[in-house]
Amino acid sequence: MTSAEPRAYPFNDVHGLTLAGRYGELQETEPVSRVRPPYGEEAWLVTRYEDVRAVLGDGRFVRGPSMTRDEPRTRPEMVKGGLLSMDPPEHSRLRRLVVKAFTARRAESLRPRAREIAHELVDQMAATGQPADLVAMFARQLPVRVICELLGVPSADHDRFTRWSGAFLSTAEVTAEEMQEAAEQAYAYMGDLIDRRRKEPTDDLVSALVQARDQQDSLSEQELLDLAIGLLVAGYESTTTQIADFVYLLMTRPELRRQLLDRPELIPSAVEELTRWVPLGVGTAFPRYAVEDVTLRGVTIRAGEPVLASTGAANRDQAQFPDADRIDVDRTPNQHLGFGHGVHHCLGAPLARVELQVALEVLLQRLPGIRLGIPETQLRWSEGMLLRGPLELPVVW
């Protein structure tokens, strides 16, 4: 059964990282329900782990229609294009070529350099003095510099990429013209880098993408450009926000910080658990569209209707995760959906894991006494954005 009147959506408060209680209520009483977002069409909202995983992994739910539909969303502008808007077979073709180049081994090989970068950033924080803004000086710096290393961008140009990435960030206070200018400069730079790697390949990801082959198939020039910039943008905002959110939780939950200080070997599993526990989005983005009538929990989703599969709610489903609202860094198994599921499972998950593990490892090693430099009630949180996180995180140690 579903209620007659769609509920206003999203449910989460942007100030903080709590998961709205409405999700748990719906899991119990109406796991497939109608919602009305502030922009776009009404949609079906799916909240139980089993159902969310099924929707994300079922070929009867696709992303392609998002290119032409007024898709349900929490922000006025629509995010279109890229791998996330494609369906098989075109999506399969591109992903197959990218996976040949962007391997878990390649991500892991960046761990030593990621550590060096993290230590350099902490050095700069220490030199600046206390309080230091962890968001500006660490969380926004580490991901873009690691991605630059991955792509093969020379160190001398890292600051340029940091500026461009900052303009792409949904929390950035820039005009549409400034964002467009940053995009044009980033595309021009990456086009030049691709040309150089065609002539003189190295062991970086751009060279590997240029050389990627699947039988007689290869990436076109535009596909190379879109993928390289897409990796930068997709990998930047999410990991930046996760670093800030995870450190915020360590500072506001002393027992959690003490546990990781005493047992740093738990950091990899802590990253998995925090990825599960933190409902990163204000709401659920990137709807899937039914290509035929599908019945889920006794509810018929008609062909063409959009479905929002809430991974944030699924990751707190008590039926899948015992004591789901508790952060348990020893939790096993932990088959969370923080990086998605199915054909659109996050390509950058191995790199994100490396970055998040290194961030916690280095910060706890270098700044074991790290704590908030202002009262928690004075923190400013991003508003009107896709992802939830503090705009600044003043810290002392």
From Swiss-Prot:
Pfam families: p450. Residues 68-78 have a biased composition (Basic and acidic residues). Pathway: Antibiotic biosynthesis; mycinamicin biosynthesis. PANTHER family: CYTOCHROME P450 YJIB-RELATED, P450, PUTATIVE (EUROFUNG)-RELATED. This is Mycinamicin IV hydroxylase/epoxidase. Disruption phenotype: Cells lacking this gene do not produce mycinamicin I, mycinamicin II and mycinamicin V, and accumulate mycinamicin IV. It comes from the Bacteria. Residues 63-86 are annotated as: Disordered. Belongs to the cytochrome P450 family. GO terms for biological process: antibiotic biosynthetic process. Keywords: Antibiotic biosynthesis, Heme, Iron, Metal-binding, Monooxygenase, NADP, Oxidoreductase. It is an enzyme of class 1 (oxidoreductase). GO terms for molecular function: heme binding; iron ion binding; monooxygenase activity; oxidoreductase activity, acting on paired donors, with incorporation or reduction of molecular oxygen. Involved in the biosynthesis of mycinamicin, a 16-membered macrolide antibiotic. Catalyzes consecutive hydroxylation (at C14) and epoxidation (at C12-C13) reactions with mycinamicin IV as initial substrate, leading to mycinamicin II. These reactions require prior dimethylation of 6-deoxyallose to mycinose for effective conversion by the dual function MycG enzyme. Heme binds at residues 91, 95, 288, 344, 346. Substrate binds at residue 81. The gene is mycG. InterPro entries: Cyt_P450 (IPR001128), Cyt_P450_B (IPR002397), Cyt_P450_CS (IPR017972), Cyt_P450_sf (IPR036396). Its cofactor is heme. It comes from Micromonospora griseorubida. The keyword Cytoplasm does not apply. Its EC number is 1.14.-.-.
